[in-house]
Regions:
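Charge-biased, low-complexity intrinsically disordered regions
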Residues: 1-221
Length: 221
């Protein structure tokens, strides 16, 4: 994969650092052991966070700032990591989708970064460009229908948008048939060390729960 960061993102977030994780995988419907880890993380949050204080987590606070700088209301279009943790703090379980989606969610809530998880074989081309959504740009969010991505950071392939920090696109989503994982960690707080730790956690989880092969990652700016 090649990742290009457009000038618009650099101008609103000059410290941005991302990580692109790739691996060959075998997905499954459910992992009891993985869900034990997710439930333990939820319990930790309920003992240490509130729905207000979670906004102060570095990765979440930085993503919210970028939304505002791009003209988007982060309380209406929440970063996915914030939405997931908020759901846990309300005493609700996360939606159980499949093992790949669930482990990406665990990595996201563990460190607070919004992470795009994709079936790499569904991309049009081998290059993704990170820019800002345009007014009227078509985008079908997973389980959300058509999403207004104007003012949202968005990754695009040759066909169009594939991922925002709020929701990934139906066209390139992961499923049980996914064999090529691409995960993008969005470090709007500029903390390369934590972005790397998040990428390494994804690889650890993929190797443990999805028979990961040839897993690797690289940093991009």
């Amino acid at each position: 994969m090649n990742i290009i960061v457009e000038d618009k993102i650099e101008s609103v977030c000059p410290s941005f650092v991302g990580a692109c994780v790739e691996a060959d995988v075998e997905n499954s419907e459910y992992s009891e052991e993985l869900w034990r880890l997710i439930d333990e993380q939820g319990e930790t949050f309920r003992n240490t966070l509130t729905t207000e204080s979670l906004k102060d987590i570095s990765a979440i606070a930085a993503t919210r700032r970028v939304y505002k700088a791009c003209g988007k209301d982060p309380s209406r279009y929440r970063p996915s990591s914030e939405a997931l943790i908020r759901r846990m703090l309300q005493g609700k379980k996360l939606y159980q989708i499949d093992t790949l989606v669930d482990l990406i969610n665990l990595a996201s809530i563990r460190y607070g970064y919004s992470i795009g998880g994709f079936d790499g074989d569904k991309f049009d081309g081998d290059t993704l460009t990170l820019g800002v959504g345009r007014e009227g740009e078509p985008y079908e969010g997973i389980g959300r229908g058509m999403l207004n991505i104007a003012g949202l950071p968005v990754y695009r392939d040759h066909t169009g948008g594939v991922g925002t920090p709020t929701s990934d696109n139906e066209r390139t989503k992961m499923g049980l048939q996914t064999r090529h994982l691409v995960a993008l960690v969005n470090g709007y707080d500029g903390n390369e060390q934590t972005v790397r730790a998040t990428a390494e956690l994804i690889i650890e989880l993929v190797n443990r729960f999805c028979n990961g092969q040839n897993a690797k990652y690289f940093i991009y700016r």
